[in-house]
C-alpha cells in the first residue's frame, strides 16, 4: 500500500481548525494550508475563513454544500467527493474542518479511506475538539476515573451503556434525533430533548448535576459552564439555553464505590488500596501530610543522574524545526536522507547519523547532552498519579 500511494501524484491532508477562532490552528496545520494546491474548508467563523484565504488564496468553502432540503449524510458524501475529485487530478489537497477533523466528522474519514484505497497518500493531522476545551475549562482529567463520550442521539438509538462511576461527555445535545440540516435551528425544535433527559435520569436520578458547556469561539468571549440538575433541565427557561453547539458534561456519582481486584493488586505487590487523588477525590485535601513532605523536599532537590538537559548549541535543532514546518524540506529529506544530511553544515557526526536514522530515540538523544539514544521510558510523561504509589 505504501508503494502504491507514492506512485500517484495527488494527495490529501485533513487538518482541524480547532474551536477558538484562528488561535487553535496548529503550526503544522498552517504549514499544510500554505503549501497546498487547493484548500477545501468547513469552519465555524469568518475570521478563521479569512485567515485560511490569506494563507492560501486558492481556497474553497464547502459549507455551501449543505442544504435544508438535504440529509446531512448526502452533504458529507458530496464534501468528501469534492476533495477526492481534485486529489485524482493530481493536486495536493488540504481539507480544513472545524474542531478536531476526526472527532464527530464524517466526510473526513470517508475521504481519507477512499483516497488510501485508491492508492493516494492521505493523512489526518490532529486538532482541538470541543472536548479538549471542556477538559481545560472545567478542570477535568479523563484518566482520573475514566471517561465516555457519546453523541446524544447515538446514545439513545443504540442504547449505549452509561457508567455512572466515570465522566460522561455528550455532544450535539441541542439537536437530539435530527438528521436534517438547517442554517438556523431554534431551541424549540429540539423536541426530543426530553428523551435524553429521561435516559440520564434513569442512570443518575433527577437531582444529579449536569454542566451545560459551550467553548468560546472568539477571544472576546468566556466559556459557558452552567450547572443544572437533570430535573432543572426540563424547565422551559433552562431548556431554551441549549443550542446546537452545546455539550453536556455529566460528573460521576460520588456515591459510586470503587471495586478493587484484590487478587490483581496482590500480584502487583501492592499492599494498600489505591485511592483517587485530589482534586478528583472530594474527601482528599490539597495539603495533607504526604503533600507537605513532598513540598519540603522541593527546596533541596537536585536533578537526578538520569536527567539529561538540552544541549546549549545544536545545529540539529534548526534542521528539525524546518522539517516540522516546511513540507518541501521534508520532501527533500525523504528523497535521500543521507544526501540531505551530508549537505547540511553545522552538524556533528552523531547528529548527522541521528538525522539519517530518523527514529525518535536517536533524534531525541542527539539533542541532549551525551548524544546517546534516549530510553523510550523517558519519552513517556505520566502526570497523573497511578494510584498505586
UniProtKB/Swiss-Prot annotation:
Residue positions where N-methylisoleucine is found in the record: 384-385
Molecular function GO labels: methyltransferase activity
EC number: 2.1.1.-
Modified residues (N-methylthreonine): 382
Uppermost EC category: transferase
Pfam families cross-referenced by the UniProt entry: TP_methylase (PF00590)
Keywords, in A-Z order: Methylation, Methyltransferase, S-adenosyl-L-methionine, Transferase
Residues the entry annotates as binding S-adenosyl-L-methionine: 98, 100, 103, 130, 172, 215, 246-247
Modified residues (N-methylleucine): 379
Positions of region (Methyltransferase domain): 1-253
One record GO biological process: methylation
Region Clasp domain: start-end pairs: 254-370
Name the UniProt record assigns to this protein: Methyltransferase/ribosomally synthesized type I borosin cyclic peptide precursor cmiMA
UniProt organism field: Coprinellus micaceus (Glistening ink-cap mushroom)
Amino acid at each position: 500500500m505504501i508503494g502504491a500511494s507514492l506512485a500517484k501524484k495527488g494527495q490529501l491532508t485533513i487538518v482541524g481548525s480547532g474551536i477558538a477562532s484562528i488561535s487553535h490552528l496548529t503550526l503544522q496545520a498552517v504549514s499544510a494550508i500554505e503549501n497546498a494546491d487547493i484548500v477545501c474548508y468547513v469552519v465555524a467563523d469568518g475570521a478563521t475563513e479569512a485567515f485560511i484565504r490569506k494563507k492560501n488564496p486558492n481556497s474553497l468553502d464547502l459549507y455551501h454544500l449543505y442544504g435544508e432540503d438535504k440529509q446531512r449524510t448526502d452533504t458529507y458524501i458530496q464534501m468528501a467527493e469534492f476533495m477526492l475529485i481534485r486529489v485524482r487530478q493530481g493536486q495536493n489537497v488540504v481539507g480544513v474542518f472545524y474542531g478536531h477533523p476526526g472527532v464527530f466528522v464524517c466526510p473526513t474519514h470517508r475521504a481519507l479511506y477512499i483516497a488510501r484505497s485508491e492508492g493516494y497518500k492521505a493523512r489526518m493531522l490532529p486538532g482541538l475538539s470541543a472536548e479538549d476545551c471542556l477538559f481545560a475549562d472545567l478542570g477535568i482529567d479523563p484518566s482520573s476515573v475514566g471517561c465516555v463520550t457519546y453523541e446524544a442521539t447515538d446514545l439513545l438509538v443504540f442504547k449505549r451503556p452509561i457508567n455512572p462511576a466515570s465522566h460522561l461527555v455528550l455532544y450535539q445535545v441541542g439537536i437530539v434525533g435530527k438528521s436534517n440540516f438547517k442554517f438556523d435551528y431554534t431551541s424549540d425544535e429540539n423536541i426530543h430533548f426530553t428523551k435524553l433527559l429521561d435516559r440520564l435520569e434513569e442512570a443518575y436520578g433527577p437531582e444529579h448535576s449536569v454542566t451545560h458547556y459551550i467553548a468560546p469561539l472568539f477571544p472576546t468571549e468566556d466559556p459557558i459552564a452552567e450547572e443544572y440538575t437533570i430535573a432543572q433541565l426540563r424547565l422551559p427557561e433552562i431548556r431554551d439555553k441549549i443550542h446546537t453547539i452545546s455539550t453536556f458534561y455529566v460528573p460521576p456519582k460520588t456515591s459510586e464505590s470503587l471495586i478493587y481486584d484484590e487478587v490483581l493488586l496482590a500480584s502487583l505487590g501492592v499492599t494498600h488500596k489505591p485511592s483517587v487523588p485530589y482534586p478528583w477525590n472530594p474527601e482528599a485535601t490539597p495539603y495533607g501530610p504526604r503533600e507537605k513532605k513532598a513540598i519540603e523536599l522541593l527546596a533541596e532537590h537536585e536533578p537526578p543522574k538520569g536527567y539529561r538537559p538540552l544541549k546549549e548549541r545544536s545545529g540539529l535543532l534548526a534542521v528539525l524545526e524546518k522539517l516540522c514546518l516546511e513540507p518541501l524540506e521534508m520532501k527533500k529529506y525523504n528523497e535521500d536522507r543521507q544526501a540531505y544530511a551530508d549537505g547540511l553544515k553545522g552538524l556533528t557526526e552523531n547528529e548527522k547519523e541521528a538525522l539519517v536514522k530518523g527514529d525518535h530515540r536517536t533524534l531525541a538523544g542527539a539533542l541532549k547532552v551525551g548524544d546517546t539514544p534516549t530510553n523510550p521510558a523517558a519519552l513517556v510523561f505520566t502526570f497523573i498519579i497511578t494510584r498505586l504509589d
